[in-house]
């Protein structure tokens, strides 16, 4: 998040933007945790939630009667609540389609507020990659005969380059027992399987 501890007396709000999930248990372990951390760190701000996936928003309403707002709806609610200064923080991993969609909605609603700040996705700079990698490896134990495989969704957006870049950075930092794959793009599962075969390792830790 950008520096948000200011002396300004304007009413502040943080909009946490996620792709979303229809699995309540997963939401409690991920999105809920992040939003609570935002609220704890920035006590002077009110935290709001928005999802970018309309499919997930509709499914949550249909199956669990849970109403989650779109980015535009949440911004309109914040304005109605008297919020004047907004920080929009995505929980997205890459600067892909969902992040572009979020930015478009923010642009369309900026006139509702005196100040609007927009944070970046997880992997936005070289240092971001390094910090993310070290954070993962600090919590992960890999045996000599094992390979850690990280799987992402993948996209036809040019931001998909983040996935092979992530694998390259793992290796450049000395973590040779790590591969990165995607479900719907490159590197695909066949690429990952080929590298696993070359490595000779028979056990995989999937993350």
Pin down the residues of each PLM region.
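Active-site-proximal alpha-helix that buttresses catalytic centers in soluble enzyme cores
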Residues: 4-207
């Amino acid at each position: 998040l950008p520096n948000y501890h200011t002396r300004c007396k304007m009413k502040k709000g943080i909009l946490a933007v996620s792709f979303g999930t229809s699995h309540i248990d997963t939401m409690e372990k991920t999105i809920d945790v992040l939003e609570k951390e935002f609220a704890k760190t920035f006590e002077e701000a009110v935290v709001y939630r928005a999802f970018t996936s309309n499919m997930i928003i509709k499914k949550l309403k249909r199956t669990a009667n849970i109403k989650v707002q779109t980015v535009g709806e949440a911004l309109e609610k914040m304005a109605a609540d008297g919020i004047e200064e907004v920080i929009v923080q995505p929980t997205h991993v890459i600067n892909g389609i969902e992040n572009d969609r979020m930015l478009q909605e923010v642009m369309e609603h900026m006139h509702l507020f005196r100040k609007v700040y927009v944070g970046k996705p997880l992997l936005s700079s070289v240092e971001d990659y390094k910090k993310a990698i070290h954070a993962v490896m600090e919590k992960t134990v890999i045996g000599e005969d094992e390979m850690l495989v990280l799987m992402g969704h993948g996209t036809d957006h040019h931001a998909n380059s983040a996935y092979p870049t992530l694998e390259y950075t793992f290796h450049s930092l000395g973590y040779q027992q790590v591969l990165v794959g995607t479900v719907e793009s490159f590197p695909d599962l066949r690429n990952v399987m080929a590298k696993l075969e070359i490595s000779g390792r028979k056990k995989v830790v999937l993350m």
